[in-house]
Design a protein with these regions (language model features):
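Short aromatic-cysteine micro-motif
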Residues: 57-58, 86-288
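Conserved "repeat-terminator" motif of extracellular CCP/Sushi domains
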Residues: 1-16
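Active-site-proximal beta-strands of protease catalytic cores
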Residues: 290-299
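Disulfide-stabilized, aromatic/cysteine-rich ligand-recognition loop
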Residues: 20, 178-192, 197, 201, ...
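GGW-centered surface loops in extracellular recognition modules
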Residues: 16-74
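Short, solvent-exposed loop/turn elements at domain surfaces
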Residues: 70-78, 149-155, 318-321
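Acidic glycine-/aspartate-rich tracts in secreted/extracellular proteins
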Residues: 13-14, 67-71, 146-149, 298-304, ...
């Protein structure tokens, strides 16, 4: 029952144990969110509205439910304990079937390539860690916001020099852009907590978010055909009232970041926003999945010249051209104002 309020308890208790009315019970047999060491639950958040946790510095993550049921795992089943190679294959195949409508067939795969910021063994082990955690716990955490920078905006980047700005997952930060896919993975991996792993999302995780949002009321059409109403796109008109937000007005040589609410957007235009600028762009407690900056994943396009994948569209695209589920391709050296990333925790 995802309507219950969950009060998470810290490790080493079992994931999903909660305290309700003085009694301890399991939050759900299908999804068992855990509280990594050093994290606290954000007050007022539940499985119904987007269960959110934050670390000691205020970085926030939202729980994405992936129900541990026979419907989701018809081949793998619900009793895996050894996690053999064949069992990992079955888990992944079942998750692909569960999210099939968002996968774009089998063109894009969670397979290793040399520009992803990991070795082949690291990639394989990371994927196994993710699959095991999702299977055992019935979900995973994803950054509530696109990864950002508090100190100031990036204005350039180099594919040969690692960025030094400290990444945060907080509202009203400058988007952490001008990063390659491999640089984004390096940055994401350093945000881990205790026994849990932080990383860019694998493609199946992005697809699982789409399926999760579908179970919470979004239509497949809104997710895979036209996401204009839910994101900062070129063709989305809106009224930003968040006075702590910032916006980048792209206008030739006069382009610059401006602090304060943008106000009313009355015509199609290119406006990059700070993270979490408007609740209009929030679904289940997760901001800016649609538009703003495109987000690197660990997927592989199978194209040697453009092997990298970014998803969710960006502020210079139309919401019916680059909906939330959309795959876009990039080179290993691609880095610009429109590419950013989001961290997952598992």
């Amino acid at each position: 029952n995802s309507d219950i309020e969950v009060t998470l308890t810290a490790e080493p208790k079992q994931p999903g144990e909660e305290t309700n009315g003085g009694s301890t019970s399991v939050s759900s047999n299908e999804t068992r969110p855990y509280l990594p060491t050093g994290f606290t639950q954000v007050k007022g958040t539940t499985l119904k509205n987007g269960l959110t946790i934050q670390d000691s510095t205020g970085n926030q993550y939202v729980w994405v439910e992936v129900p541990k049921t026979g419907k989701v795992y018809p081949t793998a089943g619900l009793n895996i304990t050894e996690f053999t190679t064949d069992e990992y294959t079955a888990i992944e195949a079942d998750l692909h079937t569960y999210t099939d409508v968002y996968r774009d067939g089998t063109i894009y795969k969670d397979e290793y390539y040399s520009g992803v910021g990991l070795t082949s063994d690291e990639y394989t082990n990371l994927k196994k860690t993710m699959l095991k955690s999702v299977y055992q716990n019935g979900g995973f955490y994803v950054g509530k916001y696109e990864t950002g920078i508090e100190s100031g905006p990036k204005t350039s980047g180099s594919s040969s020099t690692e960025p030094t700005e400290i990444p945060v997952i907080k509202q009203n930060a400058y988007p952490y852009n001008y990063v390659t896919c491999s640089q984004a993975q390096t940055l994401a991996s350093k945000m881990k907590s205790g026994n849990y792993t932080s990383s860019l999302m694998f493609g199946v995780q992005w697809d699982l978010i789409m399926k999760y949002l579908e179970t919470k009321g979004m239509s497949q059409k809104e997710l895979k055909e036209n996401s204009t109403n839910f994101g900062n796109y070129y063709n989305k008109l809106y009224n930003i009232t968040n006075i702590e937000s910032k916006y980048y007005f792209s206008h030739g040589s006069g382009s610059k970041w401006i602090s304060g609410a943008y106000g009313t957007k009355i015509s199609n235009s290119f406006i990059l926003l700070s993270t979490g600028a408007s609740d209009d762009f929030c679904k289940q407690g997760i901001y800016d999945l649609a538009g703003n900056v495109a987000e690197w994943t660990l997927e592989y396009t199978s194209e040697s010249s453009d092997p990298c994948v970014k998803r969710g569209g960006c502020y210079s695209a139309a919401g019916n051209g680059e909906p939330i589920a959309k795959h876009n391709i990039g080179q290993t050296s691609t880095k610009s104002i429109v590419e950013g990333f989001r961290v997952s925790l598992f």
